[in-house]
Amino acid sequence: MEKNLKNIEFIAEIASSHNGSIKILRKLVEKLILSNVTSIKFQIFKLNKLAHPSYKFFNALKNISIPSQAYKAIINKVLKSKKKVILEPFDNESFEFCKKFKKKVSVKISSSDNDNIDLIKTSLKYFDKVFISISGYKISSVEKLFKKLNRSKRVIFTYGFQSFPTDYRNLRMGFLKELKQKNMRVCYADHTSRDNIFE
């Protein structure tokens, strides 16, 4: 058991916890660089490429948007610290931005694109690893996708229950175990409350 635990990597996803503040984003990154997390994950989007001004959540997205140039400096800082970086682009322009880092970073395919085979195959050409969300998938569907991707060991299937806070009683952990038995690499993600994680 101890040997298996040593192989577990922990990812800290910043998401929108910076509230659109570059200053807060920098502080979060500085704290995470000093922590024991393995990777730091960023969500990247270009506001005018992601949503139309008429979209009801446009202003909310505007309030949490960070310019790509700011991300560039911060990502380079993380890479210099030897922490791993995972980027999740939400539009084509952001994807092109992520490609500039090439194999230095990994990429997460957003749920809306997890059946976009061309995008996934392009990602495998440019990035170190490719994380693909499979929440809601059946084992047979994951197997078909894995086969289409030539059973690449650089593909990491990401499963999680995304309600907040996540109720661990609703999780299908046996699902992940079955995927591992089929020689697939897996990642678990949730929104567990820090207050009830050990209940």
Model-derived features: where do they sit?
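Catalytic cores and adjacent flexible loops of soluble metabolic enzymes
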Residues: 1-199
